[in-house]
C-alpha cells in the first residue's frame, strides 16, 4: 500500500515521501495516528497544497523538542529508592520512575515511552547514564543518581 507521510517516521521517510508499506502497518498505525494518508490522486493533490503548512508545523514541533532536550540534557536527576545493605535496591527503578523524576525535577513533560534504558532497569544505588528520546532525531543524554531513601 502506498502512503504519503505527513511527518518524519523513523526508518521509513520524511514529510512528503510516498512510500510502500504493508497494509496492516498503514491501517493500524500510520493512518490512525495521523502520520500518513493513503496515496490516492486526490490526496496527492491535497497534500501538495498543504505541504508548506505541514512543513512549518513539523519545524515548530522539532524546535520545541530541541528546546526540551536542551532543558533536560547534561543534568543529574536524583531518585530515592529503598535499598538494603551493599546498595542493592528492594525492587528496581524503571522507566516510569525515571520519567516522573525528570518531569518533576526539570519542569518538562517526559513520557515513559521516551526513556531509553539500554541495560534494563536499575537495581542498585549509583549514577547511571540514560537517553531520553524526545523526538525523531532528538535525543538527550541524562544522568540518574539513585540514592537510598531515608527510612
Curated annotation (Swiss-Prot):
Cellular component GO terms held in the UniProt record: ribonucleoprotein complex; ribosome
InterPro entries documented for this protein: Ribosomal_bL9 (IPR000244), Ribosomal_bL9/RNase_H1_N (IPR009027), Ribosomal_bL9_bac/chp (IPR020594), Ribosomal_bL9_C (IPR020069), Ribosomal_bL9_C_sf (IPR036791), Ribosomal_bL9_N (IPR020070), Ribosomal_bL9_N_sf (IPR036935)
Superkingdom to which the source organism belongs: Bacteria
PROSITE patterns the record matches: RIBOSOMAL_L9
GO molecular function, a single term: structural constituent of ribosome
Any Gene Ontology biological process: translation
Statement: the UniProt record of this protein carries the keyword Phosphoprotein: no
Keywords carried by this UniProt record: Ribonucleoprotein, Ribosomal protein, RNA-binding, rRNA-binding
Described purpose of this protein according to its UniProt entry: Binds to the 23S rRNA.
Family membership: Belongs to the bacterial ribosomal protein bL9 family.
Protein's name according to its UniProt entry: Large ribosomal subunit protein bL9
Native source organism of the sequence: Francisella tularensis subsp. holarctica (strain LVS)
Gene: rplI
